[in-house]
Regions:
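Long, non-coiled-coil amphipathic alpha-helical linker/lever segments
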Residues: 1-26, 134, 138-141, 150
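Short coil/turn segments at secondary-structure boundaries
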Residues: 4-7, 39-43, 120-121
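Amphipathic alpha-helical domain-onset/packing element
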Residues: 17-48, 59-61
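ATPase nucleotide-binding head domains, primarily ABC-like/P-loop NTPase cores
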Residues: 33, 44-171
């Protein structure tokens, strides 16, 4: 009986199953983006501008990582206009968390989601990262070599003369 019912359903609706699954996937993605606004109240929506002169801009105030509890997260700010910035500090001072906060909030904003910041302005740019790179024993790639390959990809992308931000942690 169940097999017959499934066959009838498949004949009637089976050709549309891909469309149905894509719609469900899109709804789930939108719910995921919206859920941040339900659980957190320290967010804003980004002001995103086109980058016309290859000098991308970022201006964040009180930027936080969305996966760190509200009471534990430390907000930081940064303003860059087409510059290079090297972030230094002692071990366990939050450098990696800050880089991750920048990257994840940029990606969330570009997807139309909220950013965990009191103010968030950015240009449209490609987000490239070399954070927590791992080796690949099967391919004979050490961690150091994997990092070099990521940075090589970044320099190759730079040849396109397109706006980008490179977030590199510990070479």
């Amino acid at each position: 009986y169940c097999i017959d019912m499934f066959d009838k359903w498949k004949k009637s609706y089976g050709k549309n199953i891909r469309t149905y699954l894509e719609i469900v996937g899109e709804i789930e993605a939108l719910i995921s983006l919206a859920s941040i606004t339900y659980v957190r109240d320290d967010y804003t929506f980004a002001k995103v501008n086109e980058c016309n002169d290859l000098k991308p801009e970022i201006d964040f105030k009180n930027l936080k990582h969305p996966l760190i509890k509200i009471g534990d997260a430390v907000g930081n700010g940064i303003t860059l206009k087409g510059q290079t910035c090297v972030i230094t500090g002692s071990n366990m001072s939050g450098k990696t968390t800050f880089l991750r906060s920048i990257g994840i909030n940029l990606v969330l904003s570009y997807a139309g989601g909220p950013a965990l910041a009191s103010e968030f302005k950015t240009s449209v740019m490609k987000v490239l990262t070399s954070i927590r790179v791992e080796d690949n024993v099967n391919k004979g790639i050490s961690t150091f070599y994997a990092e070099l390959l990521r940075i090589k990809d970044m320099t190759e992308y730079n040849k396109n003369k397109m706006p980008m931000i490179c977030l590199i942690d510990e070479i």
